[in-house]
């Protein structure tokens, strides 16, 4: 009788264990999220270490080191992108670690994101291996920035998950020359008060 009772319960127990395992796996795979608090409002991004592991590790280390706190969006181009993470409000360039390896092609090959509206990508110079701390958020679909067999493109490693209206507000601010920049700098600084890992 006891054996029969256990046999009847066995499928339910197996299902419960399976559900618990799936839940654990889902939690383990959940993307890290970073909250940016700015003087224009807050927004949250999530990043994908399974697609661009070195880039995400680099970015999150800068977050943990408080590198982004007090930096500005120094390059804002409506109908293109908003860029920040490299200069403070006095337009002094912040020190960075060594560049991170470019992962754009590898990320796309793993099913990563393209440079679509709301995506987060690494900024760099003309040297594909020069990305350090600066990032940009696409405010339109910018397919010409995507990696290809002929071009390295720009590594996309995350996207905005909440507060996109703040990015829309930032992209529309009046811009002009400021600091070392001849154009595209907000006339009223857009300051990142803090960048915090929330998961």
Spans of features found by a protein language model:
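Cyclophilin-like peptidyl-prolyl cis-trans isomerases
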Residues: 2-8, 16-199
């Amino acid at each position: 009788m006891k054996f029969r009772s256990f046999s009847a319960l066995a499928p339910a127990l197996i299902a419960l264990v399976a559900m618990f395992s799936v839940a654990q796996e889902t939690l383990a795979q959940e993307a890290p999220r970073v909250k940016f608090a700015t003087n224009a409002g807050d927004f949250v991004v999530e990043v994908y270490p399974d697609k661009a592991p070195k880039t995400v590790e680099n970015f999150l280390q800068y977050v943990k080191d408080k590198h982004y706190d007090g930096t500005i969006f120094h390059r804002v181009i409506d109908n293109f992108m908003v860029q920040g993470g490299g200069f403070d409000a006095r337009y002094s360039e912040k020190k960075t670690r060594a560049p991170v390896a470019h992962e754009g092609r590898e990320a796309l090959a793993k099913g990563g994101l393209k440079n679509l509206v709301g995506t987060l990508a690494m900024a760099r110079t003309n040297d594909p291996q020069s990305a350090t701390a600066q990032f940009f958020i696409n405010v339109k679909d910018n397919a010409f920035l995507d990696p290809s067999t002929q071009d390295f493109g720009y590594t996309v490693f995350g996207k905005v998950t909440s507060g996109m209206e703040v990015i829309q507000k930032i992209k529309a601010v009046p811009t002009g020359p400021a600091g070392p920049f001849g154009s595209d700098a907000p006339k009223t600084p857009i300051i990142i008060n803090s960048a915090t890992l929330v998961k």
